[in-house]
Structure formats: C-alpha cells, structure tokens
C-alpha cells in the first residue's frame, strides 16, 4: 500500500468531478468549513473536525442538496488516503 497525505486549500463552494477512492479516505478540516454526506446525510464540519469516506463511495459532482458556504469562505483540509501499489488513490467517473 502507498500512503498519500495531502494538504488542500480552496475558496468558494465545492466544484469537483464525481469520483471515488478504492481505499477509504480521511478528511480533516484544518480551518474553514466543509460538508460531506458520507454518513448518508449532509453534515457541516469546521476547524478540528473530520469525516471518513468509505472505499468505493461515489461522490462529488453536482448535488443541489449540498450546503453552500459562499465564494468568500476558504477552507484548508488535510486528506489522508491509501492506495494499493500501482493504483490511483482517486478514480474520476466520466
């Protein structure tokens, strides 16, 4: 297994392509706000909180129910994920 630890910073509402991770992913909010429906319902997370995205869970893309934070909201996250040797940690769905 390979381990990926990445720090991201973004401003404005989420805008990412639909995707999944072959191995589970941990998302930790360093600062700002984020939202996830990994638990089955949308929840908002802020500084010091985290959520787990299960393996093969398809998410991202357009979801009209996703909470909106506005263009002036910036978020910094630490994302920890693993991948089997030779596999990408994120698979985008076309």
Task: Describe these PLM feature segments.
Residues 1-18, 80-83:
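A short glycine-rich, His/Asp/Glu-containing loop-to-beta-strand
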Residues 9-11, 21-36:
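Short, conserved beta-strand element in jelly-roll/cupin
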Residues 10, 33, 38-58:
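Short acidic-glycine-tyrosine-enriched beta hairpin
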Residues 62-94:
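Double-stranded beta-helix
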């Amino acid at each position: 297994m390979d381990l990926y630890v990445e720090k991201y910073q973004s401003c404005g509402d989420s805008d990412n392509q639909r995707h999944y991770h072959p191995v589970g992913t941990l998302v930790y909010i360093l600062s700002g706000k984020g939202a996830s429906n990994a638990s089955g319902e949308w929840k908002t997370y802020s500084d010091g909180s985290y959520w787990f995205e299960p393996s093969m869970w398809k998410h991202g893309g357009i979801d009209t129910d996703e909470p909106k934070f506005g263009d002036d909201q910036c978020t910094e996250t630490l994302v920890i994920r693993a991948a089997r040797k030779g596999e990408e940690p994120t698979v985008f769905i076309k």
